[in-house]
Amino acid sequence: MKIELICTGSELLTGKVNTNAAYIGSRLSAIGFEISLVTDVGDKKQDLLREFKRAFKRSNIVITTGGLGPTFDDITVETAAECLNLKIYPDEKVLNSIKEYFLKRSVAASIPKINEKQANIIRGAKVLENRVGTAPGQMLHFKFKDSEKKYRKTLFLLPGPPEEMKPIFEENVEPFLKSYSVGIKKNGVLHVFGIAESAVEEMIKPVMEEAVSGDSKFVEFGILASKSVIDIKFSVSGTDELFVDETISKLKLGFGNVLKDNIFGFDNDTLASVAGRLLLENKKTVSFAESCTGGNIAAAITDIPGSSLYFKSSVVTYSNESKMKLLGVKEETLTNFGAVSKETVKEMAEGVLKLSDSDYAFSVTGIAGPIGGTKKKPVGLVYIGSADKKKTESFKFNFSGTRKDIRKRTVNTALDLLRRKLIAKHSY
C-alpha cells in the first residue's frame, strides 16, 4: 500500500521545518506503514493541482496537511474537488460548529464571513471533527481512472497547524490504516556518546548482521549523528508480538555488549535527563561554572522537570574579571596560562564547588569562534573541569564546526562527563 503526503503552504518552501511530515512519518512507522513520498507545495493552484494528479495516479492513500483555513490562499478543498471533478457544498453542521467556536470564545456573535469557507465539504467526503480549531478534516473514498482502469483511493485532508492536525490524525487516519495492517511494527532508538560514528557502525555490524540473518525484511536499521550524539534507530516487524518484543530485547542486549557505557539512553532520553536521573538515584547535587557555553548547560539541565532536586546553580563567568571575582580564579593563573587552559578550568570548578556547596561541580572554558583562535589555541579548543570533595580533574577537547556546533558539543560533553562520573566509569 502506497501512502503519499502532500504538505501545502508557501512557508514550507522558504526553509521552515516540516514538522507535520516528521510526526506523520513516525506515527505511520509505529503501526507498520511508511510514507512513499512527501511533497511540499506552495499556495499556487496549478502547482497543487499538478501534485494531486500525480499522487492520485501513483498512491493508494493521499494525506494532505494545510490549506483548510479561511483566507484566499487556502485552496486545498477546492483544488482537490476540481481534480476529482466533484462538487463542494456548505455543510450546515460544520457551519454551526464554527459558530459555536466563536461564541464560546466570545470572539464574535456570528461567524465572520471569511470563515464560512471552512464549512465547504467535498461531495461524498466524511467530515472529521476539529475539536481545537475551525477547519474540519475530510476523508474521501473515490475511484481514480488510470488508462482504462479505475482504482479505489482514499484522500485525507488535514489542517496545517500541528495542534489541530494531530488529534484528527490519531482519531481518524490511524484507526483507518490499522484496519489494513497485517502485522506489528515497533521502533526503538539507542543514544550513544563518546565514540565516532564510523566506530559505532563497525562495532554494531555483527549485531545487525545476526539480527537480519534469518529474514532481513523483519529488521531495519539507521544511524544518525548530530553534535557527537549518535542515534541507532531500529524497527522490528512481524505478525507475532512476542517475536517482535524478543527481537528488540536481543538487539538492545547485543548493542549493550559492544557499546557498553557509551550507550547513555533509549528512546526519549537525553544526556541531561539521564544525568538528572542518576543524580537523583545517587542523592547528589551538581553546579556549573560556564564561560564559552554562556549558561547553555544550565538551560539543558533545567529543561528537565524536577531538576531543582539536584541542580544547585550555574555561574556564567565570561570575562576574566568575573572568573576572579565570582569563582576565585587567581590573577596569576589567568596571566600565565590564559582563560582557556587546564589550570583555569580547574580553579573554576573548585570555585563553583565552594560557592555552591554541591557534591559535584563542572566548569567549561573554550574558544567557540569564529574569531579568537591562535596557532597554540585554535578555535574549537575546550577545557572541561570536574571537582568534588576528593579531587579536581581537567579534560581537553578539540571540537570542530560552527560556533553553535562547538558550544553544543561542549554542553553534551560536560553532561556526559557528569553521567560517567555518576556511574564511576570514565572513558576519556
Curated annotation (Swiss-Prot):
It holds the Pfam family CinA_KH. Belongs to the CinA family. PANTHER family: NICOTINAMIDE-NUCLEOTIDE AMIDOHYDROLASE PNCC (PTHR13939), NMN AMIDOHYDROLASE-LIKE PROTEIN YFAY (PTHR13939:SF0). It comes from Endomicrobium trichonymphae. This is CinA-like protein.
